[in-house]
Amino acid sequence: MALTADVRTTRYGTPGNSTQPVNRGITAAATVYRGSIATTRSGYLVAASAPQSGDIAWGIIDKYGPGYADVAPGLVGGTSNGSVTAEIQTGSFFLQNGSGADAFTAANAGATAYVINETTAGATSNGNTRPVCGEFTDMAANLAPNRPDLAGMIVVKIGQPAGSTGGPS
């Protein structure tokens, strides 16, 4: 089910030089929500509620880009693609774990995670129909055992793998 309001997403770790925010244009008239997975299609942000295999995951949507006030839920694109921008936080974040065949376990650490929807990552590409979300790091229960609010969640380094010289951080 598509989001209808902003959500709270928790970062894992401390932001540093490798997790600088990026700014991307929003697709014309599209609405994306703070705290959701930031995906682009044809170069512009779209809601990850119905991801496509060619989408690119960047991080978590944080706020409007320069020139726009953050006063209402959601970020709405302008009359043309990219005329309104969003700031995206990069790095590792706690996301909802997929279910069934899409559920991660600790044994899957280091595996590729795929975008299921705005707040959920899973273990399968669903027949190559889902975009890469990033790298599954571990279960929240192992990384933050004293955080009951994160129960059942996973940590994903969001972004596209780039071999040994870069990629998700």
Language model: regions and residue ranges:
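Surface-exposed, low-hydrophobicity beta-strand/loop segments enriched in small/polar/acidic residues
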Residues: 1-169
